[in-house]
UniProtKB/Swiss-Prot annotation:
It holds the Pfam family SSI. Homodimer. This is Subtilase-type protease inhibitor. Belongs to the protease inhibitor I16 (SSI) family. It comes from the Bacteria. Residues 1-29 form the signal peptide. Disulfide bonds join C63-C78, C100-C130. Strong inhibitor of bacterial serine proteases such as subtilisin. InterPro entries: Prot_inh_I16_SSI, Subtilisin_inhibitor, Subtilisin_inhibitor-like_sf. Keywords: Disulfide bond, Protease inhibitor, Secreted, Serine protease inhibitor, Signal.
């Protein structure tokens, strides 16, 4: 009985290794890269928090090894995020100040994915879209 269990276990491991073998090549190819991955999904929704609303707009943003994705300004967004260390709360506002109304129409943004090899899942709420753009520049301008 013990031999059958060992044989079954070995057979399962061999089958799993064979099935996952092609994926191993992909992982090794990523290891030889000079850059840690930075692939993000950015969303915008009207509401106080992301858990209670559905995203109205979403884009992808890849920053390494080159800026690309469905984001309309990937290079500019990657520079701003890079300067902030990938932290949405630390994005420096544009040098040119923008005037916004005090109308309260909350907008919540999310940034989820991988930034320089580490998982990120961030959420931030702004009083309205004007304030969001004034404080995040090109990052959430889509």
């Amino acid at each position: 009985m013990r031999n059958r269990a060992k044989t079954a276990l070995v057979g399962t491991l061999v089958a799993a290794t064979a099935a996952l073998g092609p994926l191993g090549g992909t992982a090794h190819a990523g290891d030889s890269s000079l850059y840690a991955p930075s692939d993000l999904v950015l969303t915008i929704a009207h509401g106080e928090d992301a858990a209670s609303v559905a995203p109205e707009r979403a884009v992808t943003l890849t920053c390494e090894p080159q800026a690309r994705g469905t984001h309309p300004s990937p290079q500019e967004a990657c520079v701003l995020l890079g300067d902030a260390g990938g932290d949405v709360d630390a994005i420096a506002p544009p040098a040119e100040p923008q005037l916004c109304t005090y109308q309260y129409d909350p907008v919540v943004v999310t940034c989820x994915g991988v930034w320089q090899g580490r998982f990120v899942d961030q959420e931030r709420t702004f009083g309205n879209e004007c304030v969001m753009r004034a404080e995040t520049g090109a990052v959430f301008d889509f």
